[in-house]
Amino acid sequence: VGTFFYYVVINQTASGCEVNSEVSTIIINEGPTITTQPIGSDICLDGTANTLEVLTQNGVGTPTYQWYASTTNTYDLTNPIAGATNSTYDPATDTVGEIFYFVVISFEGGCSDIQSEIALVNTVPEPIATAVNPEQTICIDGQADTFTIDLVGGIGNPTYQWFSNTTNTNTGGTAIAGATNNNYDTGVLSTIGVFYYYIEVTLDGIGCDLAISDVFTVNVVQDPVIDTQPIDSQEICQ
């Protein structure tokens, strides 16, 4: 590594003449290295993934880039991404699954190509909150079974908010103060009628939509009454 200067001296023995060439300068640089590697991400379907980016130092000339995609965690050079020839790349997230990305960087001046680390972009389905046992009928002054959900898909940490509603729909309800767990108990219901509840689940992962459950319905009915009572006493023959 360094700067080196060369010239040649030409002698003509017969005439005794001598001439020097001009000086030629050769600069030998450090080999190129990648200082910033691409970083993968977990993301919900159709979200905006983190931009993959590389930065380099050393080498000769202007670097050229080619990004590659693979379904395996290997340096598979058989699938270059068309048009992906910059130092950054925005991966697609329109298909569920794992895609591995890396970039090959080329330089001038006889420098060897270098490859980035492999970055995994894991695209998962949107979250779905499914109501468990969504329809119940109880007697007045009774208490419904605890509402629970099955949450599948999505990425990140969930937060919960339960709502009550006056109609059989999972929009436009009233948030229930303090009802921020993944389950909910109504407490004792002392009014006859039909009551509606649902939950909204928010995930802090990249690109995840709000997950809203189906409606939980509780039908509160009057306690049963006996229309015909047994005869209180009878006399019969032996």
Feature locations, PLM:
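Solvent-exposed loop segments of extracellular immunoglobulin-like
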Residues: 58-69, 153-164
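Interdomain boundary/hinge segments at the C-termini of tandem beta-sandwich modules
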Residues: 24-30, 119-125, 216-222
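Extracellular recognition modules
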Residues: 5-11, 100-106, 161, 196-202
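Surface-exposed, flexible coil segments in extracellular/virion-facing regions
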Residues: 1, 69-93, 164-189
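Short, solvent-exposed loop/linker segments at the N-terminal edge
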Residues: 41-48, 136-143, 234-238
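Short, solvent-exposed loop/turn segments at the edges of extracellular beta-sandwich modules
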Residues: 11-17, 106-112, 202-209
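Proline-enriched interdomain boundary motifs that mark the N-terminal boundary
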Residues: 30-37, 125-132, 223-229
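A short beta-strand segment in extracellular, disulfide-stabilized domains
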Residues: 47-57, 142-152
